[in-house]
Amino acid sequence: MADLAKIVEDLSNLTLLEAAELSKLLEEKWGVSAAAPVAVATVAGAAAPAAEEKTEFDVILVDCGAQKINVIKEVRALTGLGLKEAKDLVEGAPKPIKEGASKDEAEKIKSQLEAAGAKVEFK
């Protein structure tokens, strides 16, 4: 009986994502389908996207700082824009530099722009 109590306690401590993963594993193992009532499926479906890690980021140039020329050069190198377009983008901050970038790419762009003197954020 102690083993069953431990299993119940362990299941009670699972997060929503862990419980969903357990459900999928049991469905595969036993070859069954866990059909949930509509109300429960709606609640679980609404909560799941909030727990997912964001995979795409928009890199936003907030301010060019004191070294505007260096920031313009870096923006040109990162975006392939011409001098006038890059200058307009930098002077019009806050503006997006890159939209839909992966986490690694966004971090790389942010570090390059900050090294040039800009203030950058993700959205």
Curated annotation (Swiss-Prot):
Keywords: Ribonucleoprotein, Ribosomal protein. GO terms for biological process: translation. The keyword Transcription regulation does not apply. One of its GO terms (cellular component) is cytosolic large ribosomal subunit. Forms part of the ribosomal stalk which helps the ribosome interact with GTP-bound translation factors. Is thus essential for accurate translation. PANTHER family: 39S RIBOSOMAL PROTEIN L12, LARGE RIBOSOMAL SUBUNIT PROTEIN BL12M. Homodimer. Part of the ribosomal stalk of the 50S ribosomal subunit. Forms a multimeric L10(L12)X complex, where L10 forms an elongated spine to which 2 to 4 L12 dimers bind in a sequential fashion. Binds GTP-bound translation factors. Transmembrane segments: none annotated. This is Large ribosomal subunit protein bL12. Pfam families: Ribosomal_L12, Ribosomal_L12_N. SUPFAM superfamilies: ClpS-like, Ribosomal protein L7/12, oligomerisation (N-terminal) domain.
